[in-house]
Amino acid sequence: KPTYKKFLGYRPGVAVIDDLIVGIENSDGNTNVRFHQKDTLKRFFERFEQNGLTINRFRADCGSCSEEIVEEIEKHSKSFYIRANRCSSLYNDIFALRGWKTEEINGIEFELNSILVEKWKGKAYRLVIQRQKRMDGVLDLWEGEYTYRCILTNDYESSTREIVEFYNLRGGKERIFDDMNNGFGWDRLPKSFMAENTVFLLLTALIRNFYKAIIHRLDV
């Protein structure tokens, strides 16, 4: 079915540990990113646990920032770090914050802070806030002279910088998808049916994992 970009395709859910693809479930291209995501994650986590794996830290983009998904993640992972979607109800609290700490991360200067928020009724989490002055000088209607990005977490011990740096490592995992698209045919799936294409996704992911394991053994 058509994706949000209006071409035919699929929207697989993919789990990655380190540099290895450890879980794949497929869905039609026009499904919302949160559609049955809780169920997909539950199956991923249960398979890990059946194989003796314990998840210490889980990170995901804003597509996972919903109450039922976060509840499921908390059952299986000690800590989570999820990009929080924009919430206008929090703007007043964020704008009133004092004590911003200036940090340089990857050569870019940011200001960091954190607050406790009741994201969902009766559930408080830590919101780590990262802001950067707009380079174009244009004032945003809601955010003013800064661009704000937030990370929702249940980690109350790590510093704001440590949390931002850990979450930013997620960007490196996007290169895995570049690798799969360019080297293993994920950009153009071979069949017309989801079941066959899911098999293709699984087999090519296994091949890549074997390749990475061999390269690691050879220490190349």
Residue ranges with predicted function:
Residues 1, 19, 55-65, 80, ...:
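Short, conserved catalytic/metal-binding motifs centered on acidic residues
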Residues 160-194, 199, 203, 207-211:
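Short amphipathic alpha-helical "interface-anchor" segments enriched in bulky aromatics
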Residues 210-220:
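A short, flexible helix-boundary coil/loop motif
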Residues 2-51:
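Electropositive, glycine- and tryptophan-enriched low-complexity nucleic-acid-binding patches
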Residues 1-2, 22-26, 67-73, 91-97:
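Short acidic, glycine/serine/threonine-rich loops at helix termini
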